[in-house]
Design a protein with these regions (language model features):
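Cleavable N-terminal export/targeting peptides
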Residues: 1-27, 193-195
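Short glycine/proline- and aromatic-enriched beta-strand/turn motifs that initiate or cap beta-hairpins
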Residues: 22-62, 70, 166, 183-195
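Gram-negative (and chloroplast) outer-membrane scaffold detector with strong preference
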Residues: 23, 59-130, 140, 160, ...
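Short sequence motifs at beta-strands and strand-loop junctions characteristic
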Residues: 26, 50-53, 88-92, 135-142, ...
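Membrane-spanning beta-strand positions in outer-membrane beta-barrel proteins
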Residues: 31, 69, 107-109, 148, ...
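Extracellular loop and loop/strand-boundary signature of outer-membrane beta-barrel proteins
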Residues: 42-46, 81-86, 129-135, 171-176
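Predominantly the C-terminal beta-signal and adjacent terminal strand-loop region
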Residues: 151-195
Length: 195
């Protein structure tokens, strides 16, 4: 996805969220969640060698219209050893986007979300274009598309039983500078007032 298209998509999402806020009082609630997550990342050249990174995410969502919320997420993941590469990798990302919840009128509430933002990789090896030196860090565009299932324990405390996302980023690597990753996790969710 080129830069102009990314900017267009982000501006479009922000515009739609602003219009939605002005039209109707939301029926969903504020919430904050903390999850433990594992990120399945693709490895350097030389076979799949895919690897898992341990970490976590923190999210805050604010209702904007009916079952839609604006979401902000901060995530961090780390591995001390990339297979066949003799280096570790740490990732920190910050993203924002839109979440939709399906009202089920039961203790179980599924959701889907789309997030856009950036990721910073460090404590690793990032190759450089010809004529430049490689670095131990890089920053790029990031995107996450996924969903999950929340289960009510009480009115304000929920268990995030499952959260699964496809993550895309374009940190420099030896495979065309694209990362296609799977992130799965579970955690706890605190919800505000409301219905």
């Amino acid at each position: 996805m080129n830069r102009r298209m990314r900017i267009f998509v982000n501006v479009l999402l922000l515009s739609l969220a602003s219009i939605a806020v002005a039209q109707q009082k939301p029926s969903n609630t504020l919430d904050a969640s903390v999850t433990f997550s594992e990120l399945r990342a693709n490895a350097p050249v030389g076979g799949c060698g895919c690897f898992w990174m341990a970490g976590g995410t923190g999210q805050f969502s604010y209702p904007v219209w009916r079952n839609f919320s604006a979401v902000v997420e901060v995530a961090g993941h780390h591995t001390s050893n990339i297979p066949n590469f003799k280096a570790g990798l740490s990732l920190v990302s910050g993203m924002g986007g839109v979440r939709m919840r399906w009202p089920t009128h039961t203790r179980f509430q599924p959701f889907a979300q789309v997030l856009f933002g950036g990721v910073h990789g460090f404590d690793s090896y990032f190759p450089a274009p010809i004529g430049k030196l490689p670095t131990s860090y890089d920053t790029s565009y990031a995107m996450a598309v996924g969903g999950g299932l929340d289960i009510a324990v009480s009115r304000h405390v929920w268990v995030r039983a499952l959260k699964a996302d496809y993550n895309y980023s374009s940190l420099r690597n030896l495979q065309g500078d694209n990362q296609n990753q799977l992130r799965i996790g579970a955690g706890i969710l605190f919800r505000g007032g409301g219905k």
